[in-house]
Amino acid sequence: MDRTQLLYEALESKYLAQIAGAKATLAIYFTNPVGIGEHPQHLEEMDNFIAQLAEAEDKLDCLRHLKLIDPTTPF
């Protein structure tokens, strides 16, 4: 596997991990908000995780789009 493929897969894995982390945290907030005692401002914190989720999804979409628009790219 060449470096380009490794870099592509590293970025893809990073964004997928960020998406999974944000979704897991949001699931906790939605199902048991009292379980997160150190964050009394639940809406503000949830909004921050929504922003993290949206950013990671956008980056992943962009990365995958680059692969589609230039199939000669070696990844």
Residue ranges and their predicted role:
Residues 2-75:
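Extended, charge-rich alpha-helical interface modules
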